Amino acid sequence: MQKPSLFLTFAFINKISFQMEIINISDNCSVVNLYMAELRDKNYQKNRLLFRNNVTRIGELMAYEISKTLDYEKKTVETPLGKCDTMLPSDDIVLATIFRAGLPFHTGFLNVFDHATSAFVSAYREYVDEAHTEVGIHVEYLAAPDLTGKTLIIADPMLATGGSMELGYKAFTTHGTPKHIHVAAVIAAPEGIEHVRQTFPDDKTTIWCAAIDQELNENKYIVPGLGDAGDLCYGSKI
């Protein structure tokens, strides 16, 4: 069977998005293109420090773009010489990530939103019945504040199937319902975007990415992608 073209993939994404906005920050050329090229390049990938730093840089730039969508209110700041009126963000931001690949990406967001609270989860799917028909979430570790009425940013570098993002979302929201959710990824696959659309609140979620690649392979890796982000950041695992 012929694989869908990249054009058809993007057309499909635009068709399914409806209320949920999908923003690819690489649609306009910027220094993000350079960071993405280095992340993908198998020769650059040998340098873990450079790889982590580029993931962090993309997180910083994506955080800046997200900051343009926040609510702002007028505040007065006193300088040594007088007073200055300025517009400051009024959102109460929670930066969340899923261990382990998300840590450098999370750091980039925290560098920008340095007053934000952080949330972390380590979770995986498990069957809750003997027939293996009902899937639940086993949370090994969860640290999160009350999310009620707050702006939640879930940063995970690879949005492949969307399963990990859903697990993280369900774990975090046991601590309350956020005002808005920003799903942030370095690279997204159409399958992952569709899964988020099916499992997240459509009118309260925005998907951000630095690239939308064409497909998943049989091992559920994004193609062309970059490989295993966690291994490239921290080394291979057993």
Task: Annotate each language-model stretch with its function.
Residues 5-238:
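PRPP-associated nucleotide enzymes
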